[in-house]
UniProtKB/Swiss-Prot annotation:
Species of provenance: Botryotinia fuckeliana (strain B05.10)
A Pfam cross-reference name: ArgJ
Gene Ontology biological process: L-arginine biosynthetic process; ornithine biosynthetic process
Protein EC: 2.3.1.35, 2.3.1.1
Reactions that this protein is recorded to catalyse: N(2)-acetyl-L-ornithine + L-glutamate = N-acetyl-L-glutamate + L-ornithine; L-glutamate + acetyl-CoA = N-acetyl-L-glutamate + CoA + H(+)
Residue positions binding substrate: 204, 233, 244, 331, 470, 475
Location of the protein in the cell: Mitochondrion matrix
Function: Catalyzes two activities which are involved in the cyclic version of arginine biosynthesis: the synthesis of acetylglutamate from glutamate and acetyl-CoA, and of ornithine by transacetylation between acetylornithine and glutamate.
A GO term for molecular function: L-glutamate N-acetyltransferase activity
InterPro entries: Arg_biosynth_ArgJ, ArgJ-like_dom_sf, ArgJ_beta_C
Site (Involved in the stabilization of negative charge on the oxyanion by the formation of the oxyanion hole): 165-166
Descriptive protein name: Arginine biosynthesis bifunctional protein ArgJ 1, mitochondrial
Length: 475
């Protein structure tokens, strides 16, 4: 097949469903577990059996075989808008940024977040730290996706966001990918199965595809039903600073391109930037949102409007739910843990404390062992504000030991278990503590007693499997 085989496909071709998609059924953790591995029974409840997807967006998941060991599972995701749309993205702050991060950022800047047609994603290879050749590969992926649309050039260059995820330091099998992009385009569709296959295609060590959808309304057009759908991937190397983490959100609401970047940034700060699995920030972190306005209604153009506030709330809540799915699929994780810091002098200080506890190996291993070792929580709280050795302790106003309290909040609605109250240890009922720690969900509450600000982080525990998965990652 020639690389430009889909150059003249009409837009109408986009709406033809194809039988070439691959539903997510098995072989998840493809790169660290045997191919016959199936989705764990405990995770099946997080996979939707149906969805309500935004108008004017079509998706596909196609098998390329980016990793030689992957013989049949989708590893190329394609999302297309039937009309050019507004888009925005936030990217990793890791200094070794992957080629697709650089290419996509420059493309969005060049186009001022307008005229975007698609997102193309491969899993199995991160295309990070791959030099000039890797940059050219990312550009070729975007260009090949662009060629699939029968639209004249607007003179602004490419219009496709490119993402990659997988092993760092290896070049993409670019010819295999380029040959399959027309196939992926030809297989675009709007069914639930198409969306699920696309969510599967971006997975690496994930044990299940992460897909959500919902409907919402805006104050100025209450009669219009808007839709939002999104997918994310990530199970390890998760401590976003904008895990390996990718996220893609699409909506048919009419949002002005000038507003999307700030809307997404605020949503990500309260969601993807508030999760941690292992404390490592990936070279490839990217979360993108696309809005094509296909549902109609009044365009949201003002930051001071009720529509803007309503959409911000919807986007933030949606992104938060997606981010939580990443934590629930933490590599080897057995627990979903909410870290809530309250009564802090500042939100920044509260976030530092929550973040430090969330990535503490000692806290996480204690949770896995069902050990109510609150001393580790207190220890992480105490050093959270210290950025460098030798920093004077009087520069840390956030924490007053004699005002600090720590509790476990059970997920079954039963009373909290107080571990430390105003700096004084409680007589802990170890049997009760063990009972609480048997649950999959747990909240750790830290009250600082010094203010009114708070912050929330979501994390998981560390198990033996985490070491096994990451020790075997490249094999």
């Amino acid at each position: 097949m020639a690389l430009n085989a889909c150059t003249k496909l009409p837009v109408a071709r986009l709406i033809r469903p194809s039988a070439s998609y691959h539903p997510a059924i098995s072989s998840i953790r493809y790169y660290s577990a045997p191919p016959e591995s199936t989705i764990p029974a405990a995770k099946l409840k997080y996979i939707p059996t149906s969805g309500t997807y935004p108008k004017g967006f079509l998706v596909s998941g196609t098998h390329v075989g980016v990793k030689p060991t992957n013989k049949s599972t989708p590893d190329l995701a394609f999302l297309a808008s039937e009309t050019p749309c507004a888009a925005a993205a936030v990217f990793t702050k890791n200094k070794f940024q992957a080629a697709p991060v650089t290419v996509s950022r420059k493309m969005l800047q060049r186009r001022s977040n307008t005229g975007i047609r698609s997102v193309i994603i491969n899993s199995g290879c991160a295309n990070a730290v791959t030099g000039k050749g890797g940059m050219e590969d990312a550009e070729k992926m975007g260009a090949e996706a662009d060629r699939c649309f029968d639209t004249p050039s607007d003179g602004k260059g490419g219009s496709s966001i490119v993402m990659s995820t997988g092993v760092i330091g290896q070049r993409l099998p670019i010819q295999k990918i380029l040959l399959k992009i027309p196939t992926a385009f030809d297989g675009l569709g709007s069914s639930h199965e198409h969306w699920l296959a696309t969510a599967t295609a971006i997975c690496t060590t994930d044990t299940f595809p992460k897909l959500l959808s919902r409907t919402f309304s805006l104050p100025s057009s209450p009669e219009v039903e808007y839709r939002m759908a999104g997918m994310t991937k990530g199970a390890g190397m998760i401590h976003p600073n904008m895990a390996t983490l990718l996220g893609m959100i699409a909506t048919d609401a009419p949002i002005a391109p000038t507003l999307l970047p700030s809307l997404l940034t605020k949503a990500v700060n309260k969601s993807f930037n508030s999760i941690s699995i292992d404390g490592d920030t990936s070279t490839n972190d990217t979360v993108a949102v696309l809005a094509n306005g296909a549902a109609g209604g009044k365009e949201v153009t003002s930051e001071s409007s009720e529509d803007h506030a309503a959409f911000q709330k919807v986007l933030t809540e949606f992104a938060t739910d997606l981010a939580k799915l990443v934590v629930r699929d933490g590599e080897g994780a057995t627990k979903f843990v909410t870290i809530r810091v309250t009564e802090a002098p500042s939100e920044i200080g509260a976030r530092k404390i929550a973040s430090t506890i969330a990535r503490s190996p000692l806290v996480k291993t204690a949770l896995y062992g069902k050990d109510a070792n609150w001393g580790r929580i207190l220890c992480a709280t105490g050093y959270s504000q210290i950025s460098e050795p030798g920093q004077p302790i009087n520069e840390v106003p956030e924490i007053i030991p004699e005002k600090t309290s720590v509790s476990f909040i059970p997920s079954d609605g039963s009373p909290e278990l107080k571990l430390l109250v105003n700096g004084e240890p409680e007589s802990v009922d170890e049997a009760r503590a063990a009972e609480i720690l048997e649950h999959e969900d747990l909240e750790i509450l830290i009250k600082l007693g010094g203010g009114k600000e708070e912050a929330v982080y979501w994390t998981c525990d560390f198990s033996h499997e985490y070491v096994t998965i990451n020790g075997d990652y490249r094999t």
